[in-house]
């Protein structure tokens, strides 16, 4: 009798990708963080999409919409906590993934390493844009904290921050 994980068409896909993965037997658990990054990213996108369906960014109703998500939406509290903690887990996995690459000397593969550096910059830019979305779903505090380092640049710091903010539109508790 054959094993169901090798005969069933759908389970066979999962088996080939996770269980019978053609990888060396001496591979360590440090090599899981790339896959964990993908899982964290999918969780962030899905929970963010569902949270955005219920959130309002107006200063008068933003807090009420968050309490509505936590109290009235089915498992809304779970969506909120998964989204908040998923962002932290994403960056923890990202830095551990980079640390594993440094430890095992992956920087010697310059083309692959340079693509990873570009992806790191893209992740940082995406995280920033997620905080200062044109929709107005981020706080004045978030925009100022993230861009605060740029304001320390002599002569052009203040103008650079205003340019990144898109002018003087950052002025309320939420960016609407």
From Swiss-Prot:
Parts forming coiled coils: none
> Looking at the record's lineage, which domain of life comes first?
Eukaryota
Q: Name one GO biological process term.
A: mitochondrial electron transport, ubiquinol to cytochrome c
Against CDD domains, the record matches this protein to: Cytochrome_b_N
Q: Which keywords does this chain's UniProt record carry?
A: Electron transport, Heme, Iron, Membrane, Metal-binding, Mitochondrion, Mitochondrion inner membrane, Respiratory chain, Transmembrane, Transmembrane helix, Transport, Ubiquinone
Q: Give GO cellular component annotations, separated by semicolons.
A: mitochondrial inner membrane
**Sample GO molecular function, one term:** ubiquinol-cytochrome-c reductase activity
Q: Which residues bind heme b b562?
A: 83
Q: Which residue ranges traverse the bilayer?
A: 33-53, 77-98, 113-133
**Cofactor binding note from Swiss-Prot or TrEMBL:** Binds 2 heme b groups non-covalently.
The answer to keyword Membrane applying to this record is yes
Positions of heme b b566 binding = 97
Membrane topology qualifier: Multi-pass membrane protein
Subcellular localization(s) per the UniProt record: Mitochondrion inner membrane
- SUPFAM superfamilies named among the record's database cross-references: Transmembrane di-heme cytochromes
Cofactors demanded by this protein: heme b
PROSITE patterns linked to this entry: CYTB_NTER (PS51002)
Task: State the family it belongs to.
Answer: Belongs to the cytochrome b family.
Q: Please explain the role this protein plays, according to its UniProt record.
A: Component of the ubiquinol-cytochrome c reductase complex (complex III or cytochrome b-c1 complex) that is part of the mitochondrial respiratory chain. The b-c1 complex mediates electron transfer from ubiquinol to cytochrome c. Contributes to the generation of a proton gradient across the mitochondrial membrane that is then used for ATP synthesis.
Name the record gives this protein:
Cytochrome b
The gene coding this protein: MT-CYB
